[in-house]
């Protein structure tokens, strides 16, 4: 009898789970910001010609608040 179960087990192959597609997000699913804290303001007068946005001050403020670490580039164009 155990020989029967051994042979049966060799024929049964577990199928891999199909990958679930992520639901596409549209504007109607996005609500108002929650727990928003305004850290700094960057206005048109804060932009240096040819250097992009001076982000070092804002990045330091955001890092002091905690959260995800992200590398910011001063040459990034918004």
From Swiss-Prot:
Q: Name all CRIB domain ranges.
A: 30-43
Q: Tell me which residues bear the S-palmitoyl cysteine lipid modification.
A: 10-11
State if Cell membrane is listed as a keyword: yes
Output the PROSITE patterns linked to this UniProt entry: CRIB
Gene3D superfamilies assigned to the protein according to its UniProt record, in alphabetical order: CRIB domain
**Recorded GO CC terms:** cytoplasm; cytoskeleton; plasma membrane
Q: Where in the cell is it found?
A: Cytoplasm, Cytoskeleton; Cell membrane
Q: How does it sit in the membrane?
A: Lipid-anchor
Q: Which domain of life is it from?
A: Eukaryota
A Pfam family recorded for this sequence: PBD
Q: Does S-adenosyl-L-methionine count among this protein's keywords? A: no
Q: Its Gene Ontology biological processes?
A: regulation of cell shape; regulation of Rho protein signal transduction
Name the InterPro entries on file: CRIB_dom, CRIB_dom_sf, SPEC
Entry GO MF terms: small GTPase binding
Keywords noted in UniProt: Cell membrane, Cell shape, Cytoplasm, Cytoskeleton, Lipoprotein, Membrane, Palmitate
Role according to the record: Probably involved in the organization of the actin cytoskeleton by acting downstream of CDC42, inducing actin filament assembly.
- PANTHER family assigned to the protein according to its UniProt record, in alphabetical order: CDC42 SMALL EFFECTOR PROTEIN 1 (PTHR13502:SF3), CDC42 SMALL EFFECTOR PROTEIN HOMOLOG (PTHR13502)
The entry's family comment says: Belongs to the CDC42SE/SPEC family.
The name this protein carries in UniProt is CDC42 small effector protein 1
Record the organism.
Answer: Gallus gallus (Chicken)
């Amino acid at each position: 009898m155990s020989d029967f179960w051994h042979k049966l087990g060799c024929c049964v192959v577990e199928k891999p789970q199909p990958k679930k597609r992520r639901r596409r997000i549209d504007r109607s699913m996005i609500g108002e910001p929650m727990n928003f804290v305004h850290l700094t303001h960057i206005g048109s007068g804060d932009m240096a010609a040819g250097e992009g946005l001076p982000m070092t001050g804002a990045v330091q403020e955001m890092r002091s608040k905690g959260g995800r670490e992200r590398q910011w580039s001063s040459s990034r164009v918004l």
